[in-house]
Structures are given as structure tokens and as C-alpha cells.
Amino acid sequence: MKPLRLIAVGQVRTPYFREACAHYLTAVRRYLPAEEILARDGKSADPARRKAEEAKAVLAALAPRDFVVVLDEHGPSLPSTELAALLKKRIEDPGRAPAFVIGGPFGLDKAVLDRADRLLALGPGTLPHELARVVLYEQLYRAASINAGAPYHH
């Protein structure tokens, strides 16, 4: 089984969000192998340039055969059970590892969006990127627990 790959731009700097991410990443790993890959933050003050810098790091972290799910406010949101089905299908695909990508404070460059096999929103609202990372990790834990038949999701 190929590991679930979580590719995120930058470190989580807020302590309680960092702790929550670590908690849910550990929880995900109870059910399936998962790795977190941190893409370097862009340094430019210009948002477009910064996203382009970050895109290079994100694209370098992706393997050619990854099934890339990019978090984007314009993507559809999925109920937890549908996310579980998507995760199960991707985990069971021997050729393509699932890779979830979450951007930094300015979002993701078009080059990353173009690389996506699927876009995914966490809901109709916009979340700060650190909170979005926590929510994604929790939803992936919930999806993995649904697939394992665990009682976390009622």
C-alpha cells in the first residue's frame, strides 16, 4: 500500500493548530501509512510571485504518478462518507498514491491547480490556511476510520 501523502506549504506556526495537526496525523497513521511533506514558503511580498515560488516546491514534492487532490475553494465539498470512498479507491490503486495538497495564506498557483486530478473544498466558507490544514487532517482521519469500520464517525 502506497502512503497517503499530505503536501502542505510551510510550517504551522500557531501552537494549537500545530498540535491539532500532529494529533490527527498520528490518528490517520493508525489506519494507513501517511507522510507529511512541507513545501517551502515563498518569500516574496507579492502574492502572485509568492504563489509561483511555492508552486515550484509543491510540484517538486509530487511524484509523477500521484493522484493529486488540491484543496481549493472552487472545488466541490464532499460528505465524509464520499471522501472515505475516494480515499479507499485511491489507497487501493497500486499505481497511484493519493496526494492531498494544501496551500499557504495566498492559496495555490495555477500551475498546481493544473496538476490536480481533483479539486476539493472543505465547505462553502474560506478558512485560514492553518485551520484548513487541521480540518483536512481531521477529515482524512474520519475517512480512514470509516473505511476501517471504527466508531469515530457516527
Swiss-Prot record:
Localization annotation: Cytoplasm
Enzyme category, top tier: transferase
InterPro entries: Alpha/beta_knot_MTases (IPR029028), RlmH-like (IPR003742), tRNA_m1G_MTases_N (IPR029026)
Predominant location category: cytoplasm
Cited Gene3D superfamilies: 3.40.1280.10
Assigned keywords, A-Z: Cytoplasm, Methyltransferase, rRNA processing, S-adenosyl-L-methionine, Transferase
Pfam family, one: SPOUT_MTase
A molecular-function term among this protein's GO annotations: rRNA (pseudouridine-N3-)-methyltransferase activity
Residues engaged in binding S-adenosyl-L-methionine: 71, 103
GO CC annotations, alphabetized: cytoplasm
EC code(s) of this entry: 2.1.1.177
Catalytic activity: pseudouridine(1915) in 23S rRNA + S-adenosyl-L-methionine = N(3)-methylpseudouridine(1915) in 23S rRNA + S-adenosyl-L-homocysteine + H(+)
Subunit structure: Homodimer.
Family note: Belongs to the RNA methyltransferase RlmH family.
Cited function: Specifically methylates the pseudouridine at position 1915 (m3Psi1915) in 23S rRNA.
UniProt-listed HAMAP family: 23SrRNA_methyltr_H
Protein name stated in the entry: Ribosomal RNA large subunit methyltransferase H
Protein source organism: Solidesulfovibrio magneticus (strain ATCC 700980 / DSM 13731 / RS-1)
Lineage: Bacteria, Pseudomonadati, Thermodesulfobacteriota, Desulfovibrionia, Desulfovibrionales
